[in-house]
Design a protein with these regions (language model features):
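Metal-ion/cofactor- or nucleotide/acyl-coenzyme-handling active-site neighborhoods
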Residues: 1-143
């Protein structure tokens, strides 16, 4: 058993849960979940919902997203700064600094775990940024 913490913070040691161990990694819930699946010895991992890029219309989330107003101006701020290869390998998409960080962490972890543990990672997001090292498949393929 372990305790999951999103990032190391000194107060965690005061919880006195050393018996269980600590699991500190990743910059996002998705990055942490990816590494957790490796520790649980899964050999096939499927990513869904990891666009990590703005939509063609410049939106960061679906138009009915409750906190969309908190992201106003982000596309204009990031445009041209964090372009990357699109899912499917056709063209480029606009991303952000944090999404680029998440993607690079994924790519590093995917490469590492594929080489060391023969883990296969599928990206069934069907859009957004290409995550190098994944096998791109349609969402319905994963169902």
């Amino acid at each position: 058993a372990f305790i999951l913490v999103s990032t190391y913070a000194s107060f965690i040691q005061y919880l006195k849960l050393d018996y269980f161990g600590y699991f500190n990694m990743g910059k996002s819930v998705a990055n942490m979940s990816y590494l957790l699946t490796e520790y649980l010895n899964y050999k096939n991992i499927i990513l869904i919902g990891q666009d990590l890029a703005y939509a063609k219309d410049g939106f960061s989330h679906t138009k009915d997203y409750k906190n969309l107003d908190k992201h106003e101006g982000h596309f204009q701020r990031d445009k041209g700064k964090f372009q990357c290869l699109a899912y499917g390998g056709n063209g480029k998409v606009e991303s952000s600094e944090i999404w680029t960080t998440f993607r690079l962490i994924f790519e590093n972890d995917i490469n590492y775990f594929q080489k060391l543990f023969n883990i296969t990672t599928y990206n069934c997001t069907e859009g957004g940024a290409r995550i190098e090292g994944t096998i791109e498949k349609p969402f319905l393929w994963a169902c």
